């Protein structure tokens, strides 16, 4: 009888946690958004690439709009992931611009499409400056 109760309890536990585990695996991540960037956005070139003034302006914008979630240096914040990981640093500038523009609301990243396009490129340029030079 004990073994039957143990088997039933185990089966109930498996059934109870399976939906939670499935939801956890399906939760979007910030990095998953990079896999959804359309090709035409991915190949866009940054008009401010290597522009030192754009890096400085992008830093100020980052501090105002991004640092609260991603941390002052991009390493990690209270809510957002590190921006120094290979997934971010090897992504194209066009991909980063697209993610900044469209966000990833399900993963907690706001949409920044209302920021003027030059400012979004400045943030992209600043993010590029955080990686290996």
Specify the residue positions occupied by each region the protein language model found.
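Axial heme c-ligation environment in periplasmic c-type cytochrome domains
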Residues: 22-29, 48, 77-84, 101-133
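Electrostatic cytochrome c docking/interface patches
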Residues: 30-61
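Bacterial N-terminal signal peptides
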Residues: 7-16
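N-terminal secretory signal peptides that target proteins for export/translocation
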Residues: 1-3
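The canonical Cys-X-X-Cys-His
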Residues: 58, 62-72, 123-127
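Gly/Gly-Pro-rich "capping" loops immediately C-terminal to redox-active cysteine motifs
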Residues: 52-59, 75-101
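Conserved functional loop/turn residues at catalytic and ligand-binding sites
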Residues: 65, 70-73, 87, 103-104, ...
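Processing junctions and N-termini across compartments
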Residues: 16, 60-63, 103
């Amino acid at each position: 009888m004990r073994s039957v109760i143990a088997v039933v309890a185990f089966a109930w536990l498996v059934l109870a946690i399976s939906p939670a585990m499935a939801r956890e695996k399906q939760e979007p991540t910030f990095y998953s958004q990079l896999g959804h960037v359309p090709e035409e956005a991915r190949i866009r070139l940054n008009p401010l690439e290597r522009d030192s003034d754009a890096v400085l302006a992008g830093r100020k914008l980052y501090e105002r709009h991004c640092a609260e979630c991603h941390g002052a240096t991009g390493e990690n914040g209270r809510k957002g992931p590190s921006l120094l990981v290979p997934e971010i640093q090897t992504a194209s500038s066009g991909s980063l611009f697209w993610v900044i523009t469209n966000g990833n609301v399900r993963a907690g990243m706001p949409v920044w499409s209302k920021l003027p396009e030059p400012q979004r490129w400045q943030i992209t340029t600043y993010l590029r400056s955080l990686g290996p030079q």
